[in-house]
């Protein structure tokens, strides 16, 4: 019987593609040899199955590769046909667009020619209108010049009349202003006299008021000095009271500390007696 090699008893780690034939001895149907032969037969069947599966996979891959090549050939033919069809279509589109562009160019050229003719006619008409307008402006200028000369002559006469009237009015106003200034001067003189009298009266009143204020300030300074002395006396009394209270508190604190020390000493002596 032919056997396949195996490596580990825990599982199949690797199978060799080559077979090793050997003929084991069969000492008996029962025992370790029979079990080993049974295991060997099972591995031999597994090897055969693996070889068959490998062969089937190769056949399937070969068939799949053949189908893939046929598909690629069909795709290449389809692509070539599509490329040819698109090339023909591009040529047709190019010829169509060239015809359309040529027609459009001819149409634009015709429109440009018509527009140029219309523009030329409009420019000629505009030139004629400008010429007519220049003639009208020249005639209007001559007419306006004569009118302006006539108006200037009449305006000079009116200006002279206005200047004479203004001079007459100016002389009248100068006389009126002279009379008014004389009256204002007299009024200012009377007002100045009244102001001087009022100033003297106010100065005398201010002097009297200043004397009264000076007397009031002197009395107030005396009252302030008296108040300041009273306040200083009260402050000194408060300072003395505070010092006395501080000394009393210090004495009380010393007495409290001495009492605490005496109590602590007595407590320590009592503890010593208890411990003894």
UniProtKB/Swiss-Prot annotation:
GO terms for cellular component: cytoplasm; microtubule. Residues 1-31 are annotated as: Nonhelical region. Keywords: Coiled coil, Cytoplasm, Cytoskeleton, Microtubule. InterPro entries: SF_assemblin/giardin_b (IPR008374). Its main location: cytoplasm. GO terms for molecular function: structural constituent of cytoskeleton. It is found in: Cytoplasm, Cytoskeleton. Residues 67-145 form a coiled coil. Belongs to the SF-assemblin family. Consists of a small non-helical N-terminal domain and a rod domain with a 29 residue repeat pattern based on four heptads followed by a skip residue. This alpha-helical protein is characterized by the ability to form a special segmented coiled coil and to assemble into striated fibers of 2 nm protofilaments. This is SF-assemblin. It comes from Chlamydomonas reinhardtii.
């Amino acid at each position: 019987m032919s056997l396949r090699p195996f490596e580990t008893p825990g599982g199949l780690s690797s199978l060799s593609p080559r077979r090793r034939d050997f003929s084991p001895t069969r000492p008996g149907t029962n025992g370790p040899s029979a079990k080993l032969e049974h295991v060997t037969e099972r591995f031999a069947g597994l090897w055969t199955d693996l070889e068959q599966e490998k062969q089937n996979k190769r056949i399937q891959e070969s068939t799949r590769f053949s189908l893939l090549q046929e598909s690629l050939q069909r795709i290449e033919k389809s692509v070539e046909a599509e490329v040819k069809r698109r090339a023909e279509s591009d040529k047709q589109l190019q010829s169509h667009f060239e015809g359309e562009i040529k027609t459009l160019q001819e149409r634009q050229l015709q429109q440009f020619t018509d527009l140029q003719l219309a523009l030329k006619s409009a420019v000629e008409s505009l030139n004629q209108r400008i010429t007519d307008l220049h003639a009208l402006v020249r005639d209007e200028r001559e007419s306006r010049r004569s009118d302006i000369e006539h108006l200037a002559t009449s305006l000079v006469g009116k200006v002279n009349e206005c200047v004479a009237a203004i001079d007459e009015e100016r002389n009248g106003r100068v006389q009126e202003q002279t009379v008014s200034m004389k009256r204002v001067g007299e009024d200012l003189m009377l007002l100045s006299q009244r102001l001087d009298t009022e100033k003297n009266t106010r100065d005398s009143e201010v002097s009297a008021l200043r004397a009264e204020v000076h007397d009031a300030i002197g009395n107030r300074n005396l009252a302030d000095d008296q108040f300041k002395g009273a306040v200083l006396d009260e402050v000194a009394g408060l300072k003395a009271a505070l010092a006395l209270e501080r000394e009393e508190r210090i004495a009380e604190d010393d007495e409290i500390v001495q009492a605490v020390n005496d109590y602590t000493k007595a407590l320590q002596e009592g503890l010593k007696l208890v411990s003894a």
